[in-house]
Amino acid sequence: MNKSYKILLTGSVIAIGAMGLMANSINSREAERKEINTGPVVQAEGVASKNEEWYRYYPREYDSWKQTKKSDKITDLLREKPQLAIIWAGYGFAKDYNAPRGHFYAIQDNINTLRTGAPTGPSNGPMPTACWTCKSPDVPRLMDEVGENEFFTGKWAKYGNQIVNPIGCADCHNSQTGNLGFSRPHLGRALEASGVNLDEITFQDMRTLVCAQCHVEYYFRPTEWTDKTGKTKTAKVVTLPWAKGLSAENMEEYYDEYSFKDWTHKISKAPMLKAQHPGYELFSKGIHAQNGVSCADCHMPYKQQGSIKYTDHNIGNPLDDIASTCLTCHRDSEKAFRDRVASKLERKEQLMKMAMDTLAAAHLEAGKAWELGATEAEMQPVLELLRSGQWLWDYSIASHGSFFHSPEETLRLLGVANDKGGKARIKLAAILAQHGLIGYQVPDFSTKEKAQALAGVPLQKLITEKKAFESTLLEQWNEEAVKAGRLDPKTLEGMSNKSSWSQTELSQ
Amino acid sequence: MNKSYKILLTGSVIAIGAMGLMANSINSREAERKEINTGPVVQAEGVASKNEEWYRYYPREYDSWKQTKKSDKITDLLREKPQLAIIWAGYGFAKDYNAPRGHFYAIQDNINTLRTGAPTGPSNGPMPTACWTCKSPDVPRLMDEVGENEFFTGKWAKYGNQIVNPIGCADCHNSQTGNLGFSRPHLGRALEASGVNLDEITFQDMRTLVCAQCHVEYYFRPTEWTDKTGKTKTAKVVTLPWAKGLSAENMEEYYDEYSFKDWTHKISKAPMLKAQHPGYELFSKGIHAQNGVSCADCHMPYKQQGSIKYTDHNIGNPLDDIASTCLTCHRDSEKAFRDRVASKLERKEQLMKMAMDTLAAAHLEAGKAWELGATEAEMQPVLELLRSGQWLWDYSIASHGSFFHSPEETLRLLGVANDKGGKARIKLAAILAQHGLIGYQVPDFSTKEKAQALAGVPLQKLITEKKAFESTLLEQWNEEAVKAGRLDPKTLEGMSNKSSWSQTELSQ
């Protein structure tokens, strides 16, 4: 081998090596590019319902989501606003109604509320399976596994050992792609019914619509279906009443046409509607929505960790972090924002209290009228006013922050709700007089205890039964879920199992 | 003379000439600078009340001001909203009430309205001199000449031949400097009473406050004074009730403490308050004021004529020129603005109608209760609710565009106003029943004619008298004013002398 050949060889080897390194670098960059631009597959098929499984791919998002655990305060709204127990007499909300807590508590709160009762086995208890619909990524997993009709058939207790992970990743993200998407079919159907072309939904739209899967008005529509064995069953399918539009009056017309009622009022006998939480609907009437702002823009601001930008999943009150939320668009001091929002809240609180007082008094006066022998014909216009007025009131305030999302629409609705309640009371004064009672003063409903007594809520019995349920069937559910690998036992750690009634002393 | 001397001389002459020209140029530039930076003296002393006199210095502003003559449509609000005649029964507004027209018609409308009656000489007629206060730059001229107490003493007809120029230049501009300034002392006093340091008012503040001289709530406070001859007289002094604050509730408290009433309601006998037009007060609760926007920013946008920038004095609806108003700050389409404003108006119209219907029915029911022998003690709480509810209603809608200036405050107030009216009606249903009448239906007030008949308005008599006044005393006033050089006769040219009643056929 001569020297020049050696040099040539060495050069060639170096060149080949360098090319190899370059190719390797190109390949690894291409892999990196793919990784950055493609969400990882958390689970190859179906729905990855355990939030913990998303941690390895989305550690920042997961950690911020877990911060919702800190939003753990129980605020007993029946104690703060006892009128509610009168207004909802005969319905679950008169039993127990708290201000919302973080997403982390969705399962715990659903189990703890006295509204879901104390089942002793999979086929009893007051509530249908539909009551789980918005509580957990186990819901889309189950819908995927058993079908939507089967999911919506049966009692709430049917899925006690299946639905165990609180609202989390797979509620809004596809487990194969990580992309935002609907996990609940009811929203897509409702959007189509209200004229939306699903193919034209943008990413920015989606940053609102994934929230709108749950933060909306809905009802449980009885739907007949036939199972594989040919047996006819009735599913109670979560349905959004959007076919006539999204306003309170549109939905009222929808429900009226369908002769739908949620319950018959225990005191006034009015055929009532219960608004759930039409947050998306009210938001869409407000100035932020009109300017293209999404839910996530304010409730899930972008955050920075080192060089990584991510979305904060500690969904809560944007006022907790004005610098990352309001101030990204508006120029003003934090104080100015707080004062402005406070005055909006104050106005709504005033009109809300006014309407609640009117409606509660009207229900009690209607009860008295029945007691004195009022006729169906006399009472019919009163009951219609009560149904309509209370619906408008409920629609306007049942969702988070309606006073901010759409302050003018909220105030308008509260004004009209109160007017209808007032008109019912004017009629009732005449009906009562007709039956010999002039100037009737309704009984005192100024405390939760007094109001629940008037509403006939057997609170102590409900608590006793709930406690028995929690120490038996609930423990069994959790054990089964852990054993089957559906629940990470760590999820239950450090949960104080708080409720409005855990400190209530029971009389012997 | 040698040649070099000649050259020297010629050079010197040229240099001196050039220096002279330069000095002249410097002087004329200095004069120009002064002229640009100093408003001209329209009149050496006192108030230049004839708007025509300002034309030579401010031709663009004058011409744009004169465009307010085009805003000449008469909208009879008693015809559009007949409830008003019931609500104001016993007070001037039940006689005649139109939507506002351009500043140019301030005098004509004040003379034409049936509210100012038909005086036959300087010391009779229903109204005090105070009713001229906001109508003309002749008012500050007169106050300057006779003193404020003398101005506010006597009947409206006292100044019929003095107050002849419609709202114009000297209402907001100083005749010696052209600067913005208060021409009415009541505003300065009210600002001081509400804690404002007048020395800290900025130019931008002034672009709102000159409007606030008139677009505010006020009342005529009886004030004793002694004239030069030692005679004690009572002036009715325009006073802004701001000492407790600017909200509706603040002012209500002020009036209650002072046991003030504007009139006793003819049907219900309630001691009523009439809101004037608290536009500044409501505006100051809204988002535009909170962001430092002035009245002039939207109602008097800057315009360009060649290289000259001037302020448009054709004060009217900013929606007539969205490009020069809203769009200087906001980015959106004109259509988006129109739709947004329309929905604000719609909400306010709904709650306003609701409250008016409730209040009108309550007044009529109260009238029936008195008729059936209700006692003062029974009626007292009803009358208090009527006074308070109607005040809140009136405060919320009496000014221009409250639905836009402060939509949330307007809706809140309408909701509370309606609630108070409703509570009065509930009490009245019991009082009527107590006096043997159950389920009373109030008489029909669905047209202006029906409502005015219920309110006891002698419309034909009022029109006949007004026509007589206009063909006698009014003509005399105008002749005297022209003769004394206080009125340019051209001002009256082309005025169609429109009113709500000019086309009303009188029965023989």
From Swiss-Prot, chains A, B:
Entry similarity comment: Belongs to the cytochrome c-552 family.
HAMAP family: Cytochrom_C552 (MF_01182)
Purpose: Catalyzes the reduction of nitrite to ammonia, consuming six electrons in the process.
Keywords: Calcium, Electron transport, Heme, Iron, Metal-binding, Oxidoreductase, Periplasm, Signal, Transport
Binding of heme c 4, residues: C295, C298, H299, H405
Subcellular compartments: Periplasm
Biased composition (Polar residues): 494-508
Named cofactor requirement(s): Ca(2+); heme c
Pfam families listed in its UniProt record: Cytochrom_C552
Secretion signal, residue range per the UniProt entry: 1-23
Protein name per its UniProtKB record: Cytochrome c-552
Class in the EC hierarchy, top level: oxidoreductase
Annotated residues for binding of heme c 2: C169, C172, H173, H313
Binding site for Ca(2+): E217, Y218, K274, Q276
Cellular component GO terms, alphabetical: outer membrane-bounded periplasmic space
Positions bound to substrate: Y218, H277
Region feature (Disordered): 485-508
